[in-house]
Amino acid sequence: MIAFLFYKCFAKNYKINFLYKNSSYINTNTLWLKVIYIKTKDVIIFLLLFFVAFNVSSAYVIKNLNIDCIVTPDDTINETISFVIYNNEDKNLSHISYTIPQTIRNFTINASAGVKGYSALYNEGVTEIAIEFEKPIPKGGYTNITINCFVNDAIWTKNGIKQLILSFPITSKNATIKIVLPPGAVILSPQGTLLVTPSGYKITTDGKHQIIVWDLSLNKEITFTITVKYTFISYPGQNIIEQPAINNNLKYLLIIAIFGTAIFGGLFVKEKISKRKIIERTKNIKNELTSLKNKLKEKEEEIKNLAIKIKDLEDKLSKANKNLLNKDEIISVLNERISEYESQIQKLLDENIIYKEKIESLNKYIETLKKENDKLKDKVRELSDIAKKYMEEKRGVLWSFLTEDEKIIIDLIKKHGHITQKEIVEITGMSKPKVSRIISELEDRKIIRKEKIGRINKLTLTEESKKLL
């Protein structure tokens, strides 16, 4: 029936090959499937027939959904989806369908009830999987299902930053989703905020990978979309992977040291920037205060000039009273002018008061900024002391992981700055093979390097080890 429906719906456009356990071509439960891209009209016809044939959405319940996504350095995702199907109908359950919102490849399906056959339908980045059980699930029974597949269209790269986007339909009340990033990958966190959505996650590590986990408890069906932005970091000794435990510890201590330096450096720079902003604001306020003082001086000059004009007018009025017969009329005109000037003077006086209040307010604000500046200076000094103390402690980390012979050779290199392997053999009395082996190990761990001086290769410390020794 299933094969007939698929054939009737898609015979004109493509072919689906079903292989069952009793087929003469295979002797396993695996069904091989050709990738199919479907026209819109045929999709509608197929879905109608598909849901008639597989109308079991209410016939079973999905529980205990677990999705593990392991991201590889080549941007491929190894995805494992496991869940339990419960049959809550009065009849046996022989087949189900499951949707994965990605284009998957190289997939396998296993079930505790056995898999008689399965098919996959691809359409615009979505894979619809139909599974037929070898042993139908009886009423009230259940089966465990595991789908393993590879996804290579869920990660985008721009300017060295990778963005992962995955969506999952969640019908189970309880679900766990785990994203395992590649070795050396770190989640971006500008301004201290991790670029991971949605919230509610927790981050763990197994020593090599950052792992993001969501434990979901839901009361309805949802589509759960995950986005993660990450990048890769490099560090000294990165190529030392399969080394003794002491070298692994050294690698992790170096990573911790680098991150610690970056954090303290970031805090120090942040405090410096904050201090610079306060200084700039103080400078702007001082400039504004100077401008207000200049305006106040101009207003005082205007008041002084107006007072002189008033005095001149009063003199003219006095003369007019003596010389003119219509002195009353002239006095009236002059009085009006005097009133206008007095009004202007009063207005200027009011403005003068306002400017004085602003100056007083700005002076108080300057005092506040000075106090904040002093606090920031104290904080910068405190952070500088912490950073110095941290760097002093860090310098002893690498030394504690060296053998006595390695310490002797490194002391000679530190003392002479540059030294040949032959000189080390002569000074220490060690055998040439032993010295050669120790130097080779120190070079592999990026602690020393060879530098050609003239025609002779001499040994010297690397820049990174100089900071740590």
Swiss-Prot record:
- Chain segments annotated as coiled-coil in the UniProt record: none
According to the record, the segments passing through the membrane are 42-62, 179-199, 249-269
- Keyword NAD set for record: no
Q: Where in the cell is it found?
A: Cell membrane
Q: Which InterPro entries match?
A: ArsR-like_HTH, DUF7343, WH-like_DNA-bd_sf, WH_DNA-bd_sf
Keywords, alphabetical: Cell membrane, Membrane, Transmembrane, Transmembrane helix
Keyword hit for Cell division: no
Q: Name one Pfam family in it.
A: DUF7343
Gene Ontology cellular component? plasma membrane
Q: What is its main location?
A: membrane
- Membrane topology label: Multi-pass membrane protein
Record-given protein name: Uncharacterized protein MJ1254
Annotated source species: Methanocaldococcus jannaschii (strain ATCC 43067 / DSM 2661 / JAL-1 / JCM 10045 / NBRC 100440)
